[in-house]
């Protein structure tokens, strides 16, 4: 499973403070810790920026700063094309855009960048017009529409990470099964495509969140989820991923599990 580290997000209080003060050491240490925890991508979100020009300047500072200390690709987390392109111009390696959705105008804005820079992209199974669909069938239809537009731009399906959308159980008890149904549908209908989720959304507003997150992770792994946006410094969660991949036949000869044990990464 690919792990997208979620912690470099300026809407988080401590990160926002460090960012405003241009505390390079804090940001770089956060990047290092996530890399050491097992992240394969680092999400970078400049959510404090009110304007596109300001956000572009933020990414111009963040991208080189982070890639100076970790040899990982970044997931450029923004809804605006100008800041995204600023980040992509500075990025070393194959980046990921977070995100596009099923809105036609948004797809026509983002997919040219995906093609131009040869990057990956997270695709939300929603649209700005209709919001988040209430059924797996509607979400699958949006995923298929996105795949059609991607084909027009000759974006490989394997570079698209569809997000079936995790919504909290606290507002609707069926949200977990809805996500899993959509996930299975994407793997069946768009087999070459990847899938991703913002894992911790499932437990928002509920007690013992880590317990729910771990259980949900195993269910999603069993349905074929390829990547997750999560906290890679959460040792218990990362240990659960190692165990889950071994049990589900995704770790040949349990090599990664044994390696994690030898490195002390299962002692959560």
Predicted regions: what they are:
Residues 35-72, 166-176:
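Glycine-rich, proline-tolerant flexible connector loops at the mouths of alpha/beta enzymes
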Residues 116-263:
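Catalytic alpha/beta core domains of metabolic enzymes, predominantly
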Residues 1-17, 25-28, 37, 230-268:
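Extended, intrinsically disordered, low-complexity segments
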Residues 23-34, 106, 145, 212-217:
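Short, acidic/polar
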